[in-house]
Amino acid sequence: MKLLRYGVPGHEKPGTLDASGTLRDLSGHVADLSGAALDPDKLAELESLDLAGLPAVAGNQRLGPCVAGTGKFICIGLNYSDHAAETGAKVPSEPIIFMKATSAIVGPNDDLLIPRGSTKTDWEVELGVVIGRKAKYVSEAEALDYVAGYCVVHDVSERAFQIERQGQWTKGKSCDTFGPTGPWLVTKDEVPDPQNLPMWLKVNGETMQNGSSKTMVYGVAHLVSYLSQFMSLQPGDIISTGTPPGVGMGMKPPRYLKAGDVVELGIEGLGSQKQSVRADD
């Protein structure tokens, strides 16, 4: 099932796409795509609905972030062996974890803002994992039972803030609009193998990233289990699982986003995003 949120920022409503691609309103069955509504059992109830009987939503609606109420936006660094190689970094012996501020989350097609003082704003297409029920000390074998579904995440990164300004990566990852999420939350039953998802990213029509989740160092089940040993994962938490090669900092010479650029990215079966880049006010 493809779940989404539509409407003006801060007032999005829950919806879904039917087989014909028509947007249907879900607000008569769930208040929002957050909290208990993301539990796999609740999602199964939604999947049993006759979508043709739901109200159709007319017009060209803005899509918001596909999940609401995200408490933790957890990112995994250097989790693709081919991406680690392009940056000259060693493959980590354990997952590298950092946090992205939830205030960075925006819709999949909202404008991407270059922050003040930025000279190295970079792109990263990533597979997002959305938690559906509380996970604490879970095994790898049972980890996917706690997943609601998957989405596209653009882990926008300011490399000077991230690397050159010392300390944790967080400040280079958390600028406003640096977390476009969606267009859809695709329930896990429609993603039989999260470790075999082609993904891509283009800047101004030029392909920059063309990879697959099959080159992840640590897979989805391992990451959910691993993280749950250190913190409880709550419904609506997002795990952004790393990026394949082709980021701007790995190019020779490096290449970064500038105002006027257009970024498009997507993952097979999970939809695509498109952002216009402009300077922050």
Question: What function would you assign to each model-found segment?
Answer:
Residues 1-95, 264, 281:
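N-terminal non-catalytic cap/leader segment that marks the start of a structured domain
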Residues 5, 9-10, 54-58, 62-66, ...:
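Catalytic-pocket segment enriched in acidic/His residues
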Residues 8, 91-108, 121-123, 258-269:
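Structural signature of FAD isoalloxazine-binding scaffolds in flavoprotein oxidoreductases
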Residues 96-115, 135-136, 177-186, 244-248:
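Short catalytic-site patches enriched in acidic/histidine residues
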Residues 100-102, 109, 116, 123-127, ...:
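Short, structured patches in soluble enzyme cores that scaffold and shape functional sites
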Residues 135-138, 190-192:
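Short helix-loop capping/hinge motifs at secondary-structure junctions, enriched
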Residues 136-150:
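N-terminal accessory regions of nucleic-acid-interacting proteins
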